[in-house]
Each structure stands twice: as C-alpha cells, then as structure tokens.
Amino acid sequence: MTQTVNVIGAGLAGSEAAYQLSERGIKVNLIEMRPVKQTPAHHTDKFAELVCSNSLRGNALTNGVGVLKEEMRRLNSIIIEAADKARVPAGGALAVDRHDFSGYITETLKNHENITVINEEINAIPDGYTIIATGPLTTETLAQEIVDITGKDQLYFYDAAAPIIEKESIDMDKVYLKSRYDKGEAAYLNCPMTEDEFNRFYDAVLEAEAAPVNSFEKEKYFEGCMPFEVMAERGRKTLLFGPMKPVGLEDPKTGKRPYAVVQLRQDDAAGTLYNIVGFQTHLKWGAQKEVIKLIPGLENVDIVRYGVMHRNTFINSPDVLNEKYELISQPNIQFAGQMTGVEGYVESAASGLVAGINLAHKILGKGEVVFPRETMIGSMAYYISHAKNNKNFQPMNANFGLLPSLETRIKDKKERYEAQANRALDYLENFKKTL
C-alpha cells in the first residue's frame, strides 16, 4: 500500500517538504487553510507568501545564510530555485519579486503529479505520517493540539513587517543610490539625515503610539525582526548601530558620511515599490505616517502597505524534537519551519527540506537522514534539538557560530568564514552521495 504524507501548511517550510517528498515519488496531501481562512498577516492565497520582507538576506558564502542557500541549491530546493528565478536587484542580498516567487512555487506544486492540494483548516493532527509546518500564525485550535502532543506550553513573541512605499512618491533629489561599502550593484536608495534631523525623528518615534497587544500574550522579540521603535527605546544611539547606521554609505554628492541613513530596498520586479529596511514596526498606522514623513525624501511619500505586527509561535524543540525534526515521542509526526525554532525564511525552508528528505527515505526503506553538523543545514538541525539553554530556548538564524570549530584556528574572520563555508560544502557533497 502506498503511503501518503499529510503536510499541514503551504508556507516556505511546508512547500519545500512537500516538494522533496513528491520528487522522490511519495504521494502528498498539501493542506493549506488559505483562502478558506486567512491570517492577519497574509494577503494572498499563494504558497510560500513572503510577509516580513522580500529579502532572503545575504547571498555570499561569507555569511551563514549564504552558505545555507548554496547547500539548499545543491539539494534542488524549490524555494531557492524560485528565488533565483524571481530575483530583483539588492546588492549582495538575494531579494525577490514576491508575486513571481510565490506564484512559481504555487504553480509547481499544484501541477505536480504526486501532490494533492486541500484547502481547509485543520483542527486535529491526522493519523499517519504528518509534517506540521503551520508557521507563526498557527490557529489556536491546532496550537492546543500541539501543546497536547508535546506536553509543553506554547511560547509567543512578535514578528514585525516593514512599511512598503511607492517609488514615484520619493523625492529623488534628496536620496542617492548606493549599496553599503559599494558591495555588489548599487541597489539601495539611501535617505541621509543630519544630526538635527535624526534627533527630531528619534523624539517623534518615542512619542508615537503603538498598536495594543493582547493581554494574554507576553511580548518577546527576536533580535532579527525587532520593531524599530523598541530598538529606539533602548537608547538614542541604538538605531545608529542598527537599521540607520551610516557606515559605508557616504553621500556621493558631498563625499561625507551622513549622521544617519534610512535605506530603501526594491520590493518588486518592476521597481515601483520599496520597503524601508529594518523598519519593522508595531506603531499605529497614523503614527507610522507621521514618523516616516520626517525621513528626508519621504516627506510626501505614499505608503502602500503599513507595517504590521503579528504573533509567532514556536515549541521548546530541544525537549521534544530530534535532528530529523521528528517528535521524539511520536516519530510519525515531524515539525518544520519557524515553529521548530529556526528563524528566517531560508532557515524555515531548510527545515522543511530536511523533514521531507528524511521522511521520504524512511518510507522508501533507505534509512534515516542526519545531516553532518559541519553543514549549515546540519548545524541548524543540531541547534534546535540540542540547544543548551532549553529553559529559555529562542529561535536562531543560520550563522557560523553554529558550526563546529575548524581544526586549525584562523584569526582573520573573513578567512575563517570562507574556510568554514568551503568545509560545509565539501561535507555536503560527500553526504549527497548517501542520499
């Protein structure tokens, strides 16, 4: 009898898991509640919709997520394939046209002979092999089911999405095109600020009104997607070392470094929309408008989508999951995506890739798949299943700190990262022979 796998959730992780299974001849029910039931953050019924940003972050092998992407590329990831096809200019980063990206994935999966798409809300975990990839906005009913099978309380924190603006409404006389340190093509519009302009902006941010938070949800922020107003509360200089840092962004008109810089990144292939980099926010919409208009060049800007903030849900993975993203107590159930404690689009997709490949091998009798720790994929899987501080487990991005140390110590950070990246890809190539 042919085994059919239920994959719940068609985000990046669920889409990747379904693709890896189906490409290995496994029948998949891909269950997605949208458009039958929408979430507060999604805007379409497409699979793998990008919510927080259109950037999949750095592409170079000198950063952790760049290595992760290259590993996934070599393992025929549908997410990376779609990103490469839908790429838009973004300097050294891999940014995509959201619609082209999710559209490609949606069409590929819907037309796959081994995938059946089911649009309905799931309130109970099905029998048989199941991958739960319901993401940060898991419904309350299903979240309770997960609590029941893990025996752990859910933890909540908030992801925040940055506003998107129309390029035509930007005062181009006040901004300049440049990537930090001139890396890659000049892909960012930069809004320079004097010290006086920054101080006015900063004071307005502190006075701006935030949207209310549900009383039953404790606020916890992941550093990589923290609201800029929360950063501002940490001190007047915090933003200058965060999203508004001016280093490497000298104004070509003056040759001088501004006191602060707000960067705008292209959000669509046509180049008509830009998002405000690092300005994820939970401010009320009226407050957002007032604050944004204090940024030079954006005084008369048209905001096409205001920043929003939404709950994220993840489990205490080190207590309940293994390196194959399996539930230790019920190995027929796997988790994938941000719910496992990986943080970021690419990391979420990578967890789906591991879950999908592993389950396919199990069903086909090929043995289980544990990626080497020397690979970024393997180090992420190891982190979520072995994090030392599991009493206060927090989500983690791909980074070189997760990888085992090199046998020979290299002082220069760039050279050390390059050596770790090369080792990771060598290990992956050898590991691929066993798949």
UniProtKB/Swiss-Prot annotation:
Entry's localization field: Cytoplasm
EC number: 2.1.1.74
Protein name (Swiss-Prot/TrEMBL): Methylenetetrahydrofolate--tRNA-(uracil-5-)-methyltransferase TrmFO
Catalytic reaction annotation: uridine(54) in tRNA + (6R)-5,10-methylene-5,6,7,8-tetrahydrofolate + NADH + H(+) = 5-methyluridine(54) in tRNA + (6S)-5,6,7,8-tetrahydrofolate + NAD(+); uridine(54) in tRNA + (6R)-5,10-methylene-5,6,7,8-tetrahydrofolate + NADPH + H(+) = 5-methyluridine(54) in tRNA + (6S)-5,6,7,8-tetrahydrofolate + NADP(+)
PANTHER family in alphabetical order: GLUCOSE INHIBITED DIVISION PROTEIN A (PTHR11806), METHYLENETETRAHYDROFOLATE--TRNA-(URACIL-5-)-METHYLTRANSFERASE TRMFO (PTHR11806:SF2)
Top-level taxon in the UniProt lineage: Bacteria
Species the sequence originates in: Staphylococcus aureus (strain MRSA252)
GO molecular function: flavin adenine dinucleotide binding; tRNA (uracil(54)-C5)-methyltransferase activity, 5,10-methylenetetrahydrofolate-dependent
